[in-house]
Amino acid sequence: MNLHSLYIAAIAAGAGAAFAPLTMNGADTVAEARGFSSDVILSTDAYRWQGDTIFQNEFKAWAVSPEEIRSTYKGRPGYFMPVEQTWKRKNDLSSYPRLTSNNKLHEAIYNMGLDEMVNAVEPDTTLRTGKEWAGVWTRDVSYSIILSMCYMQPEASMISLMKKVNPSGQIIQDTGSGGAWPISTDRMIWVVAAYEIYKATGDRQWLEKVYPIALRSIRKDMATVMSPRGLIKGETSFIDWREQSYPKWMQTVDISQSEAMGTNVLYAAALNACAQMADILGQRKEAARLKADAGALTDAINKYFWLDDKGYYGMYTYGRDHKIMNPRAETLGLALSILYDIAPAERQKSISTNNPHTPYGPAIFYPQISDMPSYHNNALWPFVASYWTLAQAKAGNEAGTMEGIGSVFRPAALFATNKENFNLDNGDYYTELNSSNMLWSLAGNIAITTRVLFGIHFEKDGLLISPFVPKALEGTRTLDNFNYRGATLNITVNGYGANVAKITVNGKEYAPGKTIPAKRLKGVCDIVVDMDCKPIPAMDVNRRPNLKAPVTPQTWLTNNPALNGEGVPVNNYLEWNPIEYISKYQVLKNGLLVAETRETSWPATEPGEWQVIGIDARGVPSFASEPRSNRPATIYQFKNEGTGMKSPELCNAPADGVKGYTGQGFVEIDRTTDPETINIKIPQSGMYTFALRYANGNGPVNTENKAAIRTLMLNGSKRGTFVMPQRGVGNWDDWGMSNRIQVPLTAGTYTVGITYRPENENMNINTNHALLDQLVVEKAK
């Protein structure tokens, strides 16, 4: 195609103002034309990337130059933030790696990432979370560091991570659901980020500083949040808006007892990272222990989360005494399972081809919750899409990698900034909460260039350069002025493919696929990578329209006199509300399927936990309903009950006393009170559950860090941990149940102790306070 017809084709494709007339002055022609190709690079049902322009419906965005993006996108009227329709470089980027490619839009999006990265560096050299979000957040900054800040902003990354260490020398779990840790437990991503900084910088003093913090935090978690199955309990990493990803009936205490795939995967990665730290520092025995723990957790993840019928890991377990799997696909956790080799090689391929991919990109999870607005639910987050793109490249999925790149580049171009999240139905930024200049979004933008197309991978003692270049992006691209452990790297990648044919450093050839020792990279290093330019073996992409799951049934237990009989529980009849579009209901007892019916009731003539799942005509299941138990329970009151509150740890004291307790009152507990003890009798051997009826008005349901934590002791032996999340500011009349601790017991008498131990220290440190009303004991089986 000649240059004239190239321009005409661009106009015909609707590029209009995105394309300027071409000049025809000899040797400059190719350079002038490289940003004006009408070739379609990527097309989905939602948008098209053509040349230097993104098209979506009537809107388009294009690169005027590598330092300017313009967009015609119009936002929703009345939304609290306007659409940025232009980005122009405002910061000096000369000290950062410089990209040159055969696509101007790619260069501009990368440069916008750098420009907004400079905006994110605060005067105290910490990394700001986003334009609308000041300060440092553990998970946000850690995920950003792993993607690209460890090598783009190593000093700010170090300072930011150290801001997230508390006075006890442990990693901070930021304020969150029910009072932070141990409801949310993804703070260990800090460990992975800290080790990534070491790999990028080789700074041994940094390693000596962070290793004790990592080890101390891991040991505390192992004593508190490990489930009987050897999995880590707690909220799904980063997806921390409760009803945005969990059934509405689940309280924060229920979330604290769930086992989330993504959180477990990052924890296994953290254990491996800490083991590597220990090994480098000569702590061989500790390294071996950590490696063994990582291996055991990896085995548990593969045993309990893998869904053969889906070809990927389920999202989380949920319920009360009998957990079931939420079979949704959760993209970040799946991506991490590939990137950190938690999934074996064959499962990595399966995940790559089976995780659903919508026209706008990979969902946070799939399918969506039908009666929830867009934020984590029904959303695309570019930082998650970036991790998924890295994982697709590692798995060798060319089409998946291209669609991943597009899912990040489309919104970056159309909105002329790195926003946090987008509605998965229409690709718009109208969600429950959003921000421009988001740290993890821009970090992911940069990582697509550096980690995928240039294939930069940091090892503990060197650099592995292994690009993955889809055929649609073939050509020559350079990344100059890349700093690595004091050396300046100028990297050129030629061609396309999944494999390197030849790699040279200052003219000296190195074996493709092998780590280049750090000691060989000194001064200025010109690295040239020639790809093999062979077709990448085709792999499937599980392209799916965005899908909404049916609403959750509401259930209740009643007495049906016709079902009464010896051994039959009083509440012997399970009922639920009819849902119009449900084709059948599944009835579960103790987490197992016992019946399918089109009716809205079922005889519950055996004691147990009962739930219902609705299945719509497409075969899509709802969440399981809240477990309803008709097992008999024994209730114990505490000794020395009262009605007053006097602890110095008390926050938000009630104005007119406490109401809603049973018996003569309640007992008040804090870090200094003596253990509460109750003598109980177990009449029959079996599995028993222990729970506390409690109140905690020290903070709101959705934030702060004052969850109360206590240890269950039976005859002097530790048997589990009680978690008592915040239930609302000053809500001392709102009594709820703690988690249930299952213990196998033989018949006999026991002394129950509820005590505060060092591992019960919460994130607030100073306030670990609650009111206790009852101890509830049930025979589970």
Please describe what each predicted stretch is.
Residues I197-K209, C274-R289:
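Inter-helical turn/loop segments and adjacent helix faces that build the functional surface
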Residues A501, K584-V587, R710-L712:
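Short beta-strand elements bearing conserved aromatic residues within extracellular beta-rich modules
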Residues P607, S625-K781:
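Extracytoplasmic
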Residues Q56-E58, V64, S95-G135, A156-W181, ...:
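Extended glycan-interaction surfaces of carbohydrate-active proteins
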Residues Y387, A391-P561:
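Non-catalytic C-terminal accessory modules of carbohydrate-active enzymes
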Residues N546-E580, G619-T634:
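Pro/Thr/Ser/Gly-rich low-complexity, intrinsically disordered linker/stalk tracts
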Residues W602-S622:
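Beta-strand-rich modules
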Residues F55, G135-V141, I145-T236, A260-A268, ...:
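Aromatic-rich carbohydrate-recognition surfaces in CAZymes
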